[in-house]
Design a protein with these regions (language model features):
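Globin-like tetrapyrrole-binding proteins
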Residues: 1-153
Length: 153
């Protein structure tokens, strides 16, 4: 459960995310691929090159910021992303890598607006959202046992 204070802070960042979302997500991928090159093979690099992946992620992050207190409104988005994650063998252990990269990108792009309070709220909000995805993806893997990724990844 997300605290009301966190909800209020996240919602207050929505205008900045709308304005700078693409810049944040582009920066996130730069950070993530630099620090974790092994993860790159799971991504469609043509979608990286044309910016469509960054745009989709920016839209998803903005949607989460505006609907953080109404997660059922995000169900169709979560379903679509979770199924894509299953297709590309995303594992629970990769969520902290993405989270660390996203939070650093927010700091880099938002500068002084990324206060300790804002970053703490986004850390909490990301952890909650990653649990939603991890649980949903687990259920999808359970239904499709033949699609389970190798444990060693």
């Amino acid at each position: 459960v997300i605290s009301q204070q966190t909800i209020d802070i996240i919602k207050s960042t929505a205008p900045s995310l709308k304005k700078h979302g693409q810049q944040i997500t582009t920066r996130m991928y730069e950070i993530m691929f630099r620090n974790h090159p092994e993860i790159k093979e799971q991504f469609d690099m043509s979608a990286q090159a044309d910016g469509s992946q960054s745009t989709r992620l920016a839209t998803a992050v903005y949607s989460y910021a505006t609907q953080i207190d109404n997660l059922p409104a995000l169900k169709s988005m979560v379903e679509k992303i979770a199924h894509r994650h299953v297709q590309t063998d995303v594992l629970p252990a990769q969520y902290p890598i993405v989270g660390e990269s996203l939070l650093q990108a927010m700091k880099d792009v938002l500068g002084k607006a990324a206060t300790e309070e804002v970053m703490s709220a986004w850390t909490e909000a990301y952890e909650v959202l990653s649990e939603v995805f991890i649980n949903r993806e687990h259920d999808i893997y359970e239904v499709n046992l033949d699609k389970m990724p190798p444990i060693s990844k």
